[in-house]
């Protein structure tokens, strides 16, 4: 079955194309952002992230990361403007990280890797639900935030403190009242380009919005991510040491930057 993908030697990103041929497609993510080649587009607007009414529900270990899930039945936490047309609802956020602090982000900037990357996943409300939106070229918008090793991040610590209860695949825990805005940097300057999900099914439905300013994470906080398991309870332990896809060819795309 195609559901055996992962990040190991025998099921990792270089193998995904066998079950998911779109892995070699024309708008795959992540990419390296070559800052010298970024196009300044005066049509781009500032991002409007309206997270005031966000309602977090639970946190789930899905066997390749962990998701913090949000109530997306109404316009409670939305993303608008920037490169986007229409309104996009927050459905979940998750992280990608590496086995050491010098790698782990999916996007890179002038080939530089960060320790981790936060993905805030939103879907275009004109399509009615996430599943339908994920099939459309303008269906999803993901905000990527780099995590740079430095001071401990108190907002992130709230998330990390819950990980002990979802150590293995399939476990979930209630996680109410978490403000996703607490994980955003102060400045929302961004790069944007058309891309894909970075995990199978790798659908080419994502407008990527990668923030230029990272948030902080301590080395000790990074260790906590790596205590999760890829495996389910009762299976041989496989630590979630790294879960990032490397940069894919930009092909016929341009990365635009805001502000001018």
From Swiss-Prot:
<dbReference type="GO" id="GO:0045177">
    <property type="term" value="C:apical part of cell"/>
</dbReference>
<feature type="site" description="Fine-tunes the proton-transfer properties of H-64">
    <location>
        <position position="62"/>
    </location>
</feature>
<feature type="modified residue" description="Phosphoserine">
    <location>
        <position position="165"/>
    </location>
</feature>
<feature type="modified residue" description="N-acetylserine">
    <location>
        <position position="2"/>
    </location>
</feature>
<feature type="domain" description="Alpha-carbonic anhydrase">
    <location>
        <begin position="3"/>
        <end position="259"/>
    </location>
</feature>
<feature type="active site" description="Proton donor/acceptor">
    <location>
        <position position="64"/>
    </location>
</feature>
<dbReference type="InterPro" id="IPR001148">
    <property type="entry name" value="CA_dom"/>
</dbReference>
<feature type="modified residue" description="Phosphoserine">
    <location>
        <position position="2"/>
    </location>
</feature>
<dbReference type="GO" id="GO:2001150">
    <property type="term" value="P:positive regulation of dipeptide transmembrane transport"/>
</dbReference>
<feature type="modified residue" description="Phosphoserine">
    <location>
        <position position="172"/>
    </location>
</feature>
<dbReference type="GO" id="GO:0005886">
    <property type="term" value="C:plasma membrane"/>
</dbReference>
<feature type="site" description="Fine-tunes the proton-transfer properties of H-64">
    <location>
        <position position="67"/>
    </location>
</feature>
<dbReference type="Pfam" id="PF00194">
    <property type="entry name" value="Carb_anhydrase"/>
</dbReference>
<dbReference type="GO" id="GO:0004089">
    <property type="term" value="F:carbonate dehydratase activity"/>
</dbReference>
<comment type="similarity">
    <text>Belongs to the alpha-carbonic anhydrase family.</text>
</comment>
<dbReference type="InterPro" id="IPR036398">
    <property type="entry name" value="CA_dom_sf"/>
</dbReference>
<keyword id="KW-0007">Acetylation</keyword>
<dbReference type="GO" id="GO:0018820">
    <property type="term" value="F:cyanamide hydratase activity"/>
</dbReference>
<dbReference type="GO" id="GO:0015670">
    <property type="term" value="P:carbon dioxide transport"/>
</dbReference>
<feature type="binding site">
    <location>
        <position position="94"/>
    </location>
    <ligand>
        <name>Zn(2+)</name>
    </ligand>
</feature>
<keyword id="KW-1003">Cell membrane</keyword>
<keyword id="KW-0862">Zinc</keyword>
<feature type="binding site">
    <location>
        <position position="119"/>
    </location>
    <ligand>
        <name>Zn(2+)</name>
    </ligand>
</feature>
<keyword id="KW-0456">Lyase</keyword>
<dbReference type="GO" id="GO:0044070">
    <property type="term" value="P:regulation of monoatomic anion transport"/>
</dbReference>
<keyword id="KW-0479">Metal-binding</keyword>
<feature type="binding site">
    <location>
        <position position="96"/>
    </location>
    <ligand>
        <name>Zn(2+)</name>
    </ligand>
</feature>
<keyword id="KW-0472">Membrane</keyword>
<feature type="binding site">
    <location>
        <begin position="198"/>
        <end position="199"/>
    </location>
    <ligand>
        <name>substrate</name>
    </ligand>
</feature>
<comment type="subunit">
    <text>Interacts with SLC4A4. Interaction with SLC4A7 regulates SLC4A7 transporter activity.</text>
</comment>
<dbReference type="InterPro" id="IPR023561">
    <property type="entry name" value="Carbonic_anhydrase_a-class"/>
</dbReference>
<dbReference type="GO" id="GO:0005737">
    <property type="term" value="C:cytoplasm"/>
</dbReference>
<dbReference type="GO" id="GO:0038166">
    <property type="term" value="P:angiotensin-activated signaling pathway"/>
</dbReference>
<keyword id="KW-0597">Phosphoprotein</keyword>
<dbReference type="GO" id="GO:0051453">
    <property type="term" value="P:regulation of intracellular pH"/>
</dbReference>
<protein>
    <recommendedName>
        <fullName>Carbonic anhydrase 2</fullName>
        <ecNumber>4.2.1.1</ecNumber>
        <ecNumber>4.2.1.69</ecNumber>
    </recommendedName>
</protein>
<dbReference type="InterPro" id="IPR018338">
    <property type="entry name" value="Carbonic_anhydrase_a-class_CS"/>
</dbReference>
<feature type="site" description="Fine-tunes the proton-transfer properties of H-64">
    <location>
        <position position="7"/>
    </location>
</feature>
<keyword id="KW-0963">Cytoplasm</keyword>
<comment type="function">
    <text>Catalyzes the reversible hydration of carbon dioxide. Can also hydrate cyanamide to urea. Involved in the regulation of fluid secretion into the anterior chamber of the eye. Essential for bone resorption and osteoclast differentiation. Contributes to intracellular pH regulation in the duodenal upper villous epithelium during proton-coupled peptide absorption. Stimulates the chloride-bicarbonate exchange activity of SLC26A6.</text>
</comment>
<dbReference type="GO" id="GO:0008270">
    <property type="term" value="F:zinc ion binding"/>
</dbReference>
């Amino acid at each position: 079955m195609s559901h055996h993908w992962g990040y190991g030697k025998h099921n990792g990103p270089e193998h995904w194309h066998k079950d998911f041929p779109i892995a070699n497609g024309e708008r795959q993510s992540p990419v390296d952002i070559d800052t010298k080649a970024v196009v300044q587009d005066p049509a781009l607007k500032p991002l409007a992230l309206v997270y005031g009414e966000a309602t977090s529900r639970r946190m789930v270990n899905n066997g390749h990361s962990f998701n913090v899930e949000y109530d997306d039945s109404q316009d409670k936490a939305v993303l608008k403007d920037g490169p986007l047309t229409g309104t996009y609802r927050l459905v979940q956020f998750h992280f990608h990280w590496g086995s050491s602090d010098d790698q782990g982000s999916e996007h890179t900037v002038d080939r530089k890797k960060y320790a981790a990357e936060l993905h805030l996943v939103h879907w275009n409300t004109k399509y009615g639900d996430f599943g339908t939106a994920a099939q459309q070229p303008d269906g999803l918008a993901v905000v990527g935030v780099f995590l740079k090793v430095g001071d401990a991040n108190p907002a992130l610590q709230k998330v990390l403190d819950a990980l002990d209860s979802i150590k293995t695949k399939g476990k979930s825990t209630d996680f109410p009242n978490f403000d996703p805005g607490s994980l955003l940097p102060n400045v929302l300057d961004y790069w944007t380009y058309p891309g894909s999900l970075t995990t199978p099914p790798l659908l080419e439905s994502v407008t990527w919005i990668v923030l230029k300013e990272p948030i902080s994470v301590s080395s000790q906080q990074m260790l906590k991510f790596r205590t999760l398991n890829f495996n389910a309870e009762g299976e041989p332990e496989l630590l979630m040491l790294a879960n990032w896809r490397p940069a894919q060819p930009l092909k016929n795309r341009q990365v635009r930057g805001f502000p001018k």
